[in-house]
């Protein structure tokens, strides 16, 4: 796997800055993260923006769906009262040359915009597009086979081996509770890599890395890097 997702900051450095904002991604760089994970939705006018919740109530205090706002409207809001919602292009531009990027697509309909942003920034070799939605991963691969995709999952089922094969994924991203030695052996047998989420405990991170996962996603890359010695 050419991209480096060994230590991936979840939504940047979500424990330290307003999640999925530019300050959070810059903090991940300061922490020594090798990559960041982010979430993408389309605005009403088709702009790929970086935000975890479609309903913006928790993050901005405004009861609105980001998919029903224009980008101009969404950009006026402040995440946790601190920073604005960035576009995917802004985050990719900031990450280029600094970080690999795990782009989680939360909802179908933004795949083309994601692919175009990755192409424009020349970052196909530095990104991994992930989703719980197989059709989204399939759409990304059809638009640009050079962009790697990864299958997100919470609980393991062997059907995910077939899903990974059908969408052309070389990476699966199970929740850490699903990771077992048997699972990792199955994945290696199919030529698949594993990145796991969301790991905030140093002891757990050491165990998972010792078992052979290729990367851990964490809310606090500063603390985990120091504690585990990454």
Predicted regions and their residues:
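Phosphate-group recognition and catalysis centered on beta-loop-alpha active-site segments
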Residues: 1-230
């Amino acid at each position: 796997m050419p991209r480096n997702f060994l230590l991936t900051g979840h939504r940047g450095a979500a424990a330290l800055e307003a999640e999925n904002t530019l300050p959070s991604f810059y903090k991940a760089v300061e922490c020594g993260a090798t990559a960041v994970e982010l979430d993408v939705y389309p605005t009403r006018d088709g702009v790929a923006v970086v935000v975890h919740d479609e309903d913006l109530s928790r993050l901005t205090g405004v009861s609105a769906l980001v998919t029903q706002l224009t980008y101009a409207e969404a950009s006026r809001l402040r995440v946790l009262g601190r920073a604005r919602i960035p576009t995917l292009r802004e985050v990719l531009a900031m990450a280029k040359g600094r970080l690999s990027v795990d782009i989680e697509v939360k909802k179908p309909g933004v795949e083309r915009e994601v692919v175009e942003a990755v192409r424009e920034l020349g970052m196909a070799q530095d990104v991994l597009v992930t989703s719980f939605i197989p059709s989204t991963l399939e759409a990304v691969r059809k638009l640009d086979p050079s962009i790697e995709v990864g299958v997100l999952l919470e609980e393991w089922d062997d059907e995910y081996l077939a899903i990974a094969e059908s969408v052309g994924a070389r990476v699966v991203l199970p929740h850490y509770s699903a990771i077992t030695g048997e699972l990792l052996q199955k994945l290696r047998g199919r030529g698949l890599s594993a990145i796991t989420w969301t790991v905030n405990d140093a002891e757990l991170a050491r165990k998972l890395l010792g078992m052979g996962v290729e990367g851990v996603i964490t809310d606090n890359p500063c603390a985990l890097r120091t504690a585990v010695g990454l």
